[in-house]
């Protein structure tokens, strides 16, 4: 599996680290326009100082960059620069850079090594770990891709200081998810210190990032290709979230914002189906109540949505099987499972309506 390094600064000693992992000192370094401006000089200078041969690539900082057209352009630049299978690709950025970089690495010369250097909380704790890499199709998100594990995941929590608050909260959705699905003690820590993590205070931030990354790594190690349902538990709340993202045209909602809404729906569904008790439901909701959204985002893209249309949009999600939706539910805080039985539409719709009412009450406080 991947080696995960969490430290500040993470760019020190890369030559030795690459040597230990049998990686060449020939790297294609992929940025988006934002991460190039924020971190490009530091990363490139650190690599050059240690004798790396580099090819630099930059993509627009937007979800639309996860496309065949952008990938083809980058393939061309790599071919023109004589990049062969002895090279590796270092992806410096958030989920878009990591997904596109991993997709290109998985497919170029039938696969070259990829190193992920995530710079957003969402990427550090989720998308950069586990080897799922993909691009989008007009009919759905992340539908075309590979399993291609990174050799290294290089995480520097200090880079999060560059993020706007909206991106921090978007990433926190995945962090909180790990407490829900896999680690009750981690949930307790987040319950006690959510404000410190949200404001990037140490040691709580690094603890949250490292614990999240290691939980994801552990789950992926035990069920790499989602064969026994364990890895599917990472998708707690995501079936709802992907439906919300589709309704918002994959543009108006951050993934983590949709996940936060989806977590509330999934908590209610777990309770309605008789698995999660009322006290645990309330604890979960109290934690999620602390999330902050931009003005009107919840109203416009969740409360004003048609619940039946949301349910219909959920059927484009990758977690459907044999045209049936599969839901990850909680037995208790810290223990999730993949519910293999069909869930009546009426139960799903009732969970959505309960979640909407919950958000309405939060907005009034």
UniProtKB/Swiss-Prot annotation:
First-level EC class: lyase
EC number in record: 4.2.3.4
Subcellular location per the Swiss-Prot or TrEMBL entry: Cytoplasm
Domain of life, per lineage: Bacteria
GO term, biological process aspect, one: chorismate biosynthetic process
Membership in a protein family: Belongs to the sugar phosphate cyclases superfamily. Dehydroquinate synthase family.
Role played: Catalyzes the conversion of 3-deoxy-D-arabino-heptulosonate 7-phosphate (DAHP) to dehydroquinate (DHQ).
Protein name: 3-dehydroquinate synthase
Source organism per UniProt: Chlorobium chlorochromatii (strain CaD3)
Lineage of producing organism: Bacteria, Pseudomonadati, Chlorobiota, Chlorobiia, Chlorobiales
């Amino acid at each position: 599996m991947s080696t995960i390094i969490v430290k500040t600064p993470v760019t020190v000693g890369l030559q030795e680290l690459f040597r230990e992992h049998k990686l060449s000192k020939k790297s294609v370094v992929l940025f988006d326009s934002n991460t190039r401006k924020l971190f490009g000089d530091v990363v490139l200078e650190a690599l050059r100082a240690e004798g790396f041969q580099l090819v630099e690539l930059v993509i627009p900082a937007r979800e639309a960059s996860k496309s065949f057209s952008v990938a083809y352009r980058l393939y061309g630049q790599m071919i023109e620069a004589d990049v062969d299978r002895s090279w590796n690709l270092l992806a410096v950025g958030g989920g878009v850079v990591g997904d596109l970089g991993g997709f290109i690495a998985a497919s170029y010369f039938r696969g070259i090594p990829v190193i992920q250097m995530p710079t957003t909380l969402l990427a550090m704790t989720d998308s950069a770990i586990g080897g799922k890499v993909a691009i989008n199709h007009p009919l759905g998100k992340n539908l075309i891709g590979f399993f291609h594990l990174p050799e290294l995941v290089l995480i520097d929590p200090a880079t999060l200081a560059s993020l706007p608050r909206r991106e921090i909260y978007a990433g926190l959705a995945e962090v909180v998810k790990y407490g829900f699905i896999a680690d009750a003690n981690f949930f307790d820590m987040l319950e006690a210190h959510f404000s410190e993590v949200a404001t990037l205070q140490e040691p709580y931030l690094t603890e949250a990032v490292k614990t999240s990354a290691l939980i994801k790594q552990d789950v992926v190690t035990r069920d790499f290709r989602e064969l026994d349902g364990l890895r599917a538990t990472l998708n707690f709340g995501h079936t709802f979230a992907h439906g919300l993202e589709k309704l918002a045209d994959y543009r108006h909602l951050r993934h983590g914002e949709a996940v936060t809404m989806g977590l509330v729906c999934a908590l209610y569904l777990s309770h309605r189906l008789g698995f999660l008790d009322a006290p645990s439901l309330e604890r979960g909701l109290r934690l999620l109540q602390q999330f902050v959204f931009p003005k009107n985002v919840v109203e416009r893209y969740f409360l004003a949505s048609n619940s039946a249309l949301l349910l219909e949009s959920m059927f484009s999600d990758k977690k459907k099987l044999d045209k049936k939706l599969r839901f990850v539910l909680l037995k208790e805080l810290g223990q999730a499972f993949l519910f293999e039985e069909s869930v009546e539409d009426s139960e799903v719709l009732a969970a959505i309506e309960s979640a909407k009412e919950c958000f309405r009450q939060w907005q009034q406080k």
